[in-house]
Amino acid sequence: LECYDTIFKWHTMTCPEGQNLCFYYFTWRIFLVRGCTATCPVGYSHTHCCDTDKCNN
């Protein structure tokens, strides 16, 4: 699985074994956080998880 991992859409990472979801969320409605995860993060505004390549755009 390949996910975006920075605020820039041209930078991606290959997820490690066991992390089968891409995610993004906003902290304080300003900062965008992206990456790979095993479970969807909770407790953040506008959290989105998905399971296809580069789906956390």
Swiss-Prot record:
GO terms for molecular function: sodium channel regulator activity; toxin activity. It is found in: Secreted. InterPro entries: Snake_3FTx (IPR003571), Snake_toxin-like_sf (IPR045860), Toxin_cobra-type (IPR054131). Expressed by the venom gland. Keywords: Disulfide bond, Ion channel impairing toxin, Neurotoxin, Secreted, Toxin, Voltage-gated sodium channel impairing toxin. The keyword Disulfide bond applies. One of its GO terms (cellular component) is extracellular region. It comes from the Eukaryota. Its main location: secreted. Pfam families: Toxin_cobra-type. Disulfide bonds join C3-C22, C15-C36, C40-C49, C50-C55. Belongs to the three-finger toxin family. Short-chain subfamily. This toxin shifts the voltage-dependence of Nav1.4/SCN4A activation to more hyperpolarised potentials, inhibits inactivation, and produces large ramp currents, consistent with its profound effects on contractile force in an isolated skeletal muscle preparation. This toxin produces large muscle contractions and fasciculations in the indirectly stimulated chick biventer cervicis nerve-muscle assay, which are significantly inhibited by the addition of the sodium channel antagonist tetrodotoxin. This is Delta-elapitoxin-Cb1a. It comes from Calliophis bivirgatus. The lineage of its organism: Eukaryota, Metazoa, Chordata, Craniata, Vertebrata.
